[in-house]
């Protein structure tokens, strides 16, 4: 896994994705990692005042009541030439008083692709010591594996480095999937680090608990002709490890727990249906594809496929709410917030609701895409005179509302790393041949001019930005709250793989 490097070059303001919910974080004053005049890192408030004095060699955002910091060992200096493999295990955890609660002798991973493991304030950190990994003299075979554990954000529990690996995409359950040295998976308690269900299941992408159940594969100790260990049918267990019986010929679906008391199941004919969390059949297997139930504008629904190109939306009892032929994609309709988009004519894209009704159609020369509504009920659309096969940076984006009215013309470049946060969209504008970043507000107006070389989403009222060799935080008016200078250009989370032609 990619290590979490906590230096001045990594400041991520990411959006929570949900997770462990039995503990909640009391609302406290937001703290932001910042570099002081002494070159060390501490934490400022929204006014730019240091509440935790600069004393660390690196710092990350607080998650709940804890943050990961770095303290380099004597003699180590991080530079652009530093090889990743030579970076020491020098990360630990502090609380909101700045007190160290886990000594900086570990390496942490928080997640990737803009997603935290289990949610920003509700998830875990993946913890290890890479220095424990020992290779042979040719560096081809490991002589000793590094051990892995977790730090639980809500409870503040550190499990210790007790396993070969863990599955960090935790759910809202108290149990974390862990993997032992025999490559079997079991479950540990997030709040104590103690084993609850012994490691006895197939360990390939182990299931988290959802709705009180998880789907697991029991290991078949018989080996096939290639010498690989097999696995039996997938079934359900509860949080004590007790198996939940399913009807004959019915198997649980791996990765799935109970969503709204519905567990996806499959029969011997490979058709999908649904049972409840007690293992009772609710919707007879009849679909060639199926999805988990989720909240939508039509209530709690799931998208299913009856036959080739024949898709529908069902409720919790299997009643068909809508059904239509959809030929444009092998995996069927992709609803987001209850809507999907479709190319309906030359230079025309339409927004459709879950009943297949057209909300609006947008006809523009060279239009190549239309997005689904964001939290502010606006949709991005993209125009590209060269067609839809060109690189993303050659497209220009605009915004349209739910009435099909264009809020801003397609004149902006939209970074693929950014979403919508606290009323602002990050956009890119070409100025004198250089890409500069700024922010649009909900009206589509340029609220903060495109003057930044790097920019992050707003989080708790501030956004991290960079201008040349200066970086720091701005408020929602674009005012500099706290900035510092650096000698070398930092690593940028905003990157472009190619130059515009």
For each of these PLM feature ranges, what is it?
Residues 6-7, 344:
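General helical structural elements
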Residues 1-4:
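Positively charged n-region of N-terminal signal peptides that target proteins for export
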């Amino acid at each position: 896994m990619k290590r979490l490097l906590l230096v001045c070059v990594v400041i991520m303001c990411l959006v929570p994705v949900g997770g462990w919910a039995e503990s909640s974080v009391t609302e406290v004053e937001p703290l932001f990692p910042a570099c002081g005049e002494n070159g060390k890192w501490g934490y400022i408030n929204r006014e730019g005042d240091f509440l935790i004095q600069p004393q660390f060699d690196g710092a990350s955002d607080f998650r709940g009541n804890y943050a990961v910091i770095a303290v380099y060992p004597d003699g180590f200096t991080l530079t652009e030439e530093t090889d990743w493999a030579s970076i020491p295990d020098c990360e630990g955890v502090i609380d909101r008083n700045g007190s160290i609660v886990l000594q900086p002798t570990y390496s942490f991973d928080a997640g990737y692709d803009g997603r935290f493991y289990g949610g920003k304030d509700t998830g875990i950190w993946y913890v290890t010591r890479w220095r424990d990994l020992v290779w042979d003299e040719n560096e081809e075979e490991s002589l000793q594996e590094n051990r892995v554990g977790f730090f639980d954000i809500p409870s503040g529990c550190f499990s210790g480095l007790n396993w070969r690996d863990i599955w960090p995409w935790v759910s809202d359950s108290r149990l974390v999937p862990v993997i032992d040295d025999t490559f079997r998976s079991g479950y540990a308690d997030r709040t104590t680090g103690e084993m609850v269900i012994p490691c006895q299941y197939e360990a390939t992408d182990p299931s988290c608990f959802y709705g009180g159940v998880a789907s697991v594969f029991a290991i078949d100790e018989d080996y096939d002709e290639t010498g690989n260990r097999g696995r039996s049918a997938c079934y359900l267990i509860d949080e004590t490890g007790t198996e939940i019986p399913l009807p004959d010929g019915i198997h649980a679906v791996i990765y799935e727990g109970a969503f709204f008391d519905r567990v996806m199941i499959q029969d011997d004919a490979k058709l999908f249906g649904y049972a409840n969390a007690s293992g009772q059949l609710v919707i007879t297997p009849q679909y060639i594809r199926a999805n988990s139930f989720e909240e939508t504008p039509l209530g709690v629904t799931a998208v299913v496929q009856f036959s080739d190109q024949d898709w529908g939306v069902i409720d919790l009892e299997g009643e068909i709410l809508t059904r239509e032929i959809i030929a444009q994609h092998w995996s069927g309709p992709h609803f987001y917030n209850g809507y999907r988009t479709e190319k309906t004519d030359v230079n025309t894209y339409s927004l459709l609701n879950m009943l297949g009704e057209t909300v609006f159609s947008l006809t523009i020369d060279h239009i190549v895409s239309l997005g689904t509504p964001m939290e502010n009920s606006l949709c991005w659309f993209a125009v590209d005179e060269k067609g839809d096969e060109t690189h993303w940076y050659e497209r220009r984006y605009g915004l349209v509302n739910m009435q099909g009215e264009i809020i801003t013309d397609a004149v902006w470049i939209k970074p693929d790393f950014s979403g919508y946060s606290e009323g602002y969209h990050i956009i890119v504008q070409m100025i004198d041949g250089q890409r500069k970043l700024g922010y649009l507000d909900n009206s589509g107006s340029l609220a903060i001019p495109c003057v930044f070389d790097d920019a992050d989403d707003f989080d708790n009222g501030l956004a991290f930005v960079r201008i040349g060799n200066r970086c720091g935080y701005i408020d929602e008016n674009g005012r500099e709250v706290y900035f510092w200078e650096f000698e070398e250009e930092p690593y940028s989370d905003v990157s472009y793989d190619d130059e515009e032609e």
